[in-house]
Structures are given as C-alpha cells and as structure tokens.
C-alpha cells in the first residue's frame, strides 16, 4: 500500500499569521469536532483566518474558527458554525503554552489544519506580534531577494 501524498493531508493554512506575527515554536494539537463538522472539513468548508487560541481553566480552546455546515450532513440538528472548540494536548504542552501566552507580547495562533491518520490536527504556534516597521523590513527583504534572483538569472544567461 502506497503512502498518501502529504499535499492531500493539508486542509487550510492561516496565511495572515505569517504576515502579522513572528512564529517561534509549533505544537501539534488534536481538535474536538462533532460529526457534521468533520464532514464539512472534508468538504473544505472551514475558515481559520480570524481565529485565535486562548487558555481557560487549564484547557486550550480555539475561538473564531468558522465551519460552514453542509445541508445534507446537518439536517437533523442546528449547527453552530462559530462555536468554541477544545484543543487536545498533553499536560506538559498546555503548561508550556500557558507560560508562553502569559509573557508580554506573545499569543497563541492556529497556523494550519491537516489530516493525520484520519484525525484533524491543528498546528498551534507561539507567536509574537510584528510591529509596522518589522512588516516593512520583511517586505524589503523579500523584494531584495526577488531582485537578487533576477540579477543572478540575468547574469547566468550572459555566460
């Protein structure tokens, strides 16, 4: 039996996180979903752009994740698209996340969702907010790398 392509395991990525935060440490967390939510995630009807993670009572929760219900899968219940979802982590990981989130300027952000052995996993990152000048500096660096690659490409053509 061949191994599945890892690109197929990808569900969604929060691209805004890379622009607004410096990501320092990543954790893999499970997520407690209801049946209709799993079906909607399989259909790709999830959005984590405006979501964030908070710690309450020694438990970690995902807020603001929007899962649009499928009409066929959620006809017998009243689905709540933007409910709070519990993240499943080991106790030592929760302790590390609590310590990181209490530091000044740090927060917990969901980076991506993906499938692993049939379960939905969340990539949780300890993030530090970027200032406006940090964003400008990153943009300058990206522009310089693009220019540099163009120069190198043009130079190789001349040889």
Swiss-Prot record:
Cellular localization per UniProt: Cytoplasm
GO CC term (a single one): cytosol
GO molecular function per UniProt: RNA binding
Gene Ontology terms: biological process: trans-translation
PROSITE patterns named among the record's database cross-references: SSRP
Keyword terms: Cytoplasm, RNA-binding
Highest taxon of the lineage: Bacteria
Function statement: Required for rescue of stalled ribosomes mediated by trans-translation. Binds to transfer-messenger RNA (tmRNA), required for stable association of tmRNA with ribosomes. tmRNA and SmpB together mimic tRNA shape, replacing the anticodon stem-loop with SmpB. tmRNA is encoded by the ssrA gene; the 2 termini fold to resemble tRNA(Ala) and it encodes a 'tag peptide', a short internal open reading frame. During trans-translation Ala-aminoacylated tmRNA acts like a tRNA, entering the A-site of stalled ribosomes, displacing the stalled mRNA.
The family this protein is said to belong to: Belongs to the SmpB family.
Stated name of the protein: SsrA-binding protein
Species this protein is from: Dichelobacter nodosus (strain VCS1703A)
């Amino acid at each position: 039996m061949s191994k599945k392509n890892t690109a197929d395991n990808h569900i969604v990525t929060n691209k805004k996180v890379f622009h607004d935060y410096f990501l320092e440490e990543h954790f893999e967390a499970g997520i407690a979903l209801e049946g209709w939510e799993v079906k909607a995630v399989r259909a790709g009807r999830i959005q984590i752009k405006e979501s964030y993670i908070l710690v309450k009572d020694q438990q970690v929760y995902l807020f603001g994740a929007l899962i649009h219900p499928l009409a066929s899968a959620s006809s017998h219940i009243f689905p709540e698209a933007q409910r709070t979802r519990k993240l499943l982590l080991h106790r030592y990981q929760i302790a590390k996340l609590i310590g990181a989130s209490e530091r000044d300027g740090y927060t917990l952000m969901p980076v991506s969702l993906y499938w692993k052995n049939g379960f939905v996993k969340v990539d949780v990152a300890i993030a530090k907010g970027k200032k406006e000048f940090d964003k400008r500096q990153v943009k300058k660096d990206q522009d310089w790398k693009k220019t540099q690659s163009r120069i190198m490409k043009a130079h190789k053509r001349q040889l």
